[in-house]
Amino acid sequence: MLLSYDFKIEFYNEKQSLEKDTSSGDSLIEETPKIIINTQYGIHVDISISNMFSNYNFVKSKQAKIVLWNLPLDFNDHIKVGDIVKIYYKKFAHEKKFDFIMAGYLGTPMSTDYPSGDFSVELDVRLAVSSNFFNRKLENKSFKGMTVEDAIKSVFPDRNTINMDEKDRLQIIDKNIYASTPKEFIDKIKGVYIHDVIADYGNNNSNVECIYIFTNDRTTEPDEKYKALEDYGLEFIPQQEITIEGEYSIRRIYWNAQIFYTHKIKIGDKVSFIDGLGKMIKTTIKETSARLSNTGDCSLILKLKDDSN
């Protein structure tokens, strides 16, 4: 069965509400999209998704660049900075259901006319990493005596994915960690109880634009715990990259891989592949990015941390 990617892009107005309605940091949007772009009707769309640091430079999140080709010249009159954009995809022509990729806030649209007569609109969509959410006042401000998992869940309710070994998740916080905001909480536990925190795609079934993935360097697990990248259309044998990190010059092994685009592979997942010598390499996904087009290739690009490190 041949892959035939199509995309649906929805544009929403952000709902005007009282400050108390958004004190949790969630954005409220109108129920019905004001514009829907569906590539099944002949529209050419190119999308790239990359990693960037948010206004809080300790949190890395996603940014999408969408290029729409040959739309009506007045298209930009119907969208505005701050609109909420949702992006969906499907892999096969016979499929009816579109799966969610990401949502975010629209930046300033850029239009370009080409000598060939083509016309493009370039849209910058940034994963919503809300200042309201990071600076909201916490009810529980002291975390000493709690497990790392319970502390994270109390600060990031319904927004957390904890990709850590059980030992690390259940570790008791024995330091005097006091934080009045989520921003302060991350400042104090990162590098002590967690290795990294990354904002990633949220769940389309709610108003939450992003979730926060908490990771530690995890140990190697049994083979059955790993997803084989070959099952997801591995495009080439991953390339090895060796870096020296930290003040103790720790040697780290990473791999760069590329598979057919899917929403079923996420940061923190355990994945494996067979190298050129026939050996199974076990890794953890460190970063993801994507190149998508309904007229070209659709790839998910992975940075993998070797679990043998």
Q: Residue spans of the language-model regions?
A:
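Assembly/oligomerization scaffold segments
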Residues: M1-D124, Y254
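Short beta-strand-centered interaction patches in the first periplasmic/extracellular domains
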Residues: I101, D113-N132, D158-E245
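Extracytoplasmic/secreted envelope proteins and their assembly/folding machinery
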Residues: E149-K153, K183-I186, R252, I265
